[in-house]
Structures are given as structure tokens and as C-alpha cells.
């Protein structure tokens, strides 16, 4: 995860500079917002929510803001934390093409749907997360996160989503909404507490970060961080990294290798899909920029925050899959574009 902080900073700064909010731009409002009455309450089930997401993504692929499904008058959109109008930003202004990797999480209870996907942006592989909030059958919120520079070594795990993140859970085996939310929050509790026993982890839990498996790797080990380079087994440091890469989700966190994280606020456990047993979160990792490393002469840590989407496959109250991407770094003190006061 730490390498994700370093690798994403230039991409983030480029996005923040891509364009500020300017002009109204094309907006598919479909008339003035009517006065609300109880008769306007229409259910939007899972298929309805997925339809909104598919319609939105197709509009992006077509470069046609007018093809976006109906929008609320006060619709709000951000891209990598910057507030923009529909039709602005990298996803709208670049050539964007779909790939075979797509995870869709839909929550009819709170009217939210999220997609975690690999796209082609300008011919380059990119990792993208999008969240829509639907109210009265209109899109009220749009949140977009993306990063490019995906190395070819990450593509094998970004070709087909794991079944535990896309398959339906049999109705008789589904986990309650409350337990799904609790399990997702326990992951962040474990990270903040540097204690894997706090988390509701299954023994076979596997975490993927930016397309790399960083835990529970089979012998002789693999990556313990999302980096194209494998640890060098001929060095003591590489041997230790290989050892950590083979640990379970719980045991790895307990080594305190992630103690550079000061806090995770807000966590934003936003989309709970009981049908799939999957929870989508949009956490904000605040790094401790005052902590020094082992060398007393080393400079303080980098003052960066990390913004991402983390998706959890949860069955029987335990986390079996973690899919984390894209990693976008934000200068310390800036927030996620949705939560006032975040970033410190």
C-alpha cells in the first residue's frame, strides 16, 4: 500500500490540474425538479441500479453527456476529489473503452451503486472506481476515481474478477446487512489498531491491491505491496518481504507493517450488496507525516493521504476477498471531495 502512495502522486496532481469547475456544460436534467409527493416514491431494485450504472458508463464510452440517465437538478460530480461538471474531466474527455474486468455492487436500501473496473483510457490500462447515488430515479451523486500507469504484470489479476465478488450468494446463506457492515468496518479497525485479530478475516482471505496479490501468497512467496518488482530472495530484506507476503490477512496486519497509517477517516462504508455478499467502501487513509523511520537522521514521512475504493467479499460474517484500487494520493490536508474536515 505504501508504494501505492508513492506511485500515484504524479497521477493525482495531474488530475487536479486537468480542469476546475467551469460553465454549466450539458446536463440531462429532463425538466425542473418537481415538488415531492409520496406518489413519486418508486422502488429502484438491484437491476434498476445496475441499469443506471450501465447507462452512465455507456454515455462515457460514447462521449455523450446527453445520454446520461436522468439527473437531479442538484447533481454533484467529483473526479479524483475535484468537483467538475458532467462532461468534464479525464473520463469524459478521453477515449475510454471497457475491458473484461468489472465488479458491480448495488444497494437498493440506500439507492447506491458502485463499479470497480479496468478501462482503457487513451489506449492505456487504467483502474477506475465509480459510485452513483440514485434518488427518486435520478442520479444525485457521481464519484469517480481513476489512475493510469498499470504495469503489464498486474493484468493477469485484472482480467477476470474473483467469483466471490460477482456471484450471487444463495438466499439461504446470505449474511445480514448489519453483519456485512460490521465485517467491513472490522478491516479498518484492524489496520488502525495494527492488530489483525480485530478483523473478521477468513483464513483464506486474499487481498489484491492495484492488481497484485499482497497476502496469502503460496510458497516461495510473492509481493507484499502493489509493486511490479518481486522481492529479491538473495537479500535479507527480500527474504523478509517474501515471508510477510505468505502470511494471512490477520497475521500480516499484526506485524505492524502498515503502521505508517495514522488513521482511516472517513471510512465511507457506502454500498452494501446483500445479494452478492459484497460491500464497497471509499476510505481515506491519512498517513502520519511526522513519524520517522529507523534511522534517526531520516526525514519525516511524506505528508500524503490515500483515496481509494476497497471492496470486500464477505461470507458467513468473514472477509474472504479484498479488492483495493485505484490508489490516488492527495496532498495532506485536502479532503476526498465529499467529507468536510477529512484529510488531517
Predicted region positions:
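Positively charged n-region of N-terminal signal peptides that target proteins for export
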Residues: 1-4
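C-terminal and inter-domain tail/linker signature
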Residues: 21-344
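Bacterial N-terminal signal peptides
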Residues: 7-17
Amino acid at each position: 500500500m505504501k508504494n501505492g502512495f508513492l506511485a500515484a502522486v504524479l497521477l493525482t496532481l495531474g488530475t487536479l490540474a486537468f480542469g476546475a469547475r467551469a460553465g454549466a456544460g450539458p446536463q440531462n436534467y429532463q425538466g425542473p425538479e418537481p415538488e415531492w409527493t409520496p406518489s413519486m416514491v418508486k422502488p429502484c431494485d438491484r437491476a434498476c441500479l445496475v441499469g443506471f450504472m450501465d447507462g452512465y458508463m455507456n454515455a462515457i464510452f460514447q462521449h455523450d453527456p446527453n445520454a446520461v440517465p436522468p439527473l437531479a437538478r442538484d447533481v454533484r460530480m467529483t473526479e479524483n476529489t475535484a468537483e467538475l461538471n458532467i462532461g468534464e474531466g479525464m473520463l469524459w474527455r478521453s477515449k475510454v473503452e471497457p475491458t473484461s474486468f468489472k465488479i458491480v455492487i448495488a444497494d437498493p436500501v440506500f439507492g447506491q451503486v458502485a463499479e470497480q473496473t479496468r478501462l482503457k483510457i487513451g489506449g492505456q490500462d487504467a483502474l477506475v472506481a465509480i459510485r452513483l447515488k440514485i434518488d427518486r430515479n435520478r442520479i444525485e451523486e457521481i464519484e469517480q476515481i481513476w489512475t493510469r500507469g498499470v504495469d503489464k504484470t498486474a493484468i493477469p489479476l485484472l482480467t477476470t474478477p474473483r467469483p466471490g465478488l460477482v456471484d450471487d450468494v444463495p438466499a439461504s446463506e446470505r449474511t445480514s446487512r448489519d453483519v456485512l457492515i460490521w465485517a467491513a468496518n472490522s478491516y479498518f479497525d484492524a489496520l488502525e489498531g495494527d492488530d489483525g485479530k480485530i478483523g473478521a478475516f477468513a483464513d483464506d482471505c486474499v487481498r489484491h491491491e492495484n492488481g497484485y496479490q499482497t497476502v496469502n501468497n503460496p510458497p516461495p512467496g510473492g509481493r507484499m505491496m502493489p509493486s511490479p518488482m518481486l522481492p529479491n530472495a538473495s537479500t535479507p530484506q527480500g527474504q523478509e518481504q517474501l515471508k510477510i507476503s505468505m502470511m494471512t490477512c490477520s497475521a500480516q496486519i499484526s506485524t505492524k507493517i502498515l503502521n505508517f497509517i495514522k488513521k482511516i477517516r472517513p471510512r465511507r462504508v457506502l454500498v452494501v450488496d446483500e445479494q452478492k455478499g459484497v460491500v464497497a467502501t471509499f476510505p481515506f487513509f491519512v498517513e502520519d507525516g511526522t513519524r520517522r523511520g529507523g534511522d534517526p537522521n531520516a526525514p519525516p514521512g511524506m505528508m500524503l493521504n490515500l483515496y481509494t475504493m476497497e471492496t470486500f467479499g464477505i461470507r458467513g460474517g468473514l472477509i474472504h476477498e479484498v479488492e483495493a484500487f485505484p490508489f490516488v494520493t492527495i496532498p495532506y490536508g485536502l479532503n476526498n471531495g465529499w467529507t468536510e474536515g477529512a484529510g488531517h
